A protein has these predicted regions:
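Catalytic toxin/effector domains delivered as secreted proteins or via bacterial secretion systems
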Residues: 2-146
Length: 146
């Protein structure tokens, strides 16, 4: 897994410098097109900016093992949407989603979220529990984060 994106070829194709974006994540579990990611430095959890795989879904995991967000990427390898969990210090204390990387737009809250996104969220949460991602994250932190 590359940095805030998945590969040098996409970085170069999009005209982005790969220097700042390499090596930020490790996949701790893969299920089909869904990758569960941990940030290598154990710091702030941000979703990758882009993906090398069209339609990829990344689930970013916080250092404490909880889900930070679920992000899907479009045919141009850029973020299509993200479904985010609330966290301490966040003004938004409920599950919500953002479409693309547009800033300044209000999030869509769970009650107004289209059913297909709710279904994706529920599928990811089920896989998270089924594969013991919380425990895998804790093991990852013991081995990799200083």
């Amino acid at each position: 897994m590359g940095g805030r994106g998945a590969g040098m070829s996409v970085n170069n194709y999009l005209g982005w410098s790969s220097e700042r974006r390499t090596g930020e994540y490790d996949a701790i579990h893969v299920d089909g097109n869904i990758k569960f990611l941990m940030q290598k430095d154990g710091g702030r959890t941000a979703a990758p900016i882009f993906s090398n795989t069209e339609g990829r879904i990344y689930v970013t995991i916080r250092p404490d093992g909880t889900i930070a967000g679920i992000t899907q990427y479009d045919s141009n390898h850029k973020q299509l949407f993200s479904i985010n969990e609330p966290h301490s210090g966040d003004r938004i204390q409920q599950v919500h989603m953002h479409s693309s990387l547009e800033t300044g737009r209000k999030p869509t809250y769970w009650k107004d979220m289209p059913q297909k996104y709710k279904n994706l969220y529920n599928t990811v949460k089920q896989k998270y529990k089924e594969y013991g991602i919380n425990e895998k994250a804790k093991e990852y932190n013991k081995k990799h984060v200083r």
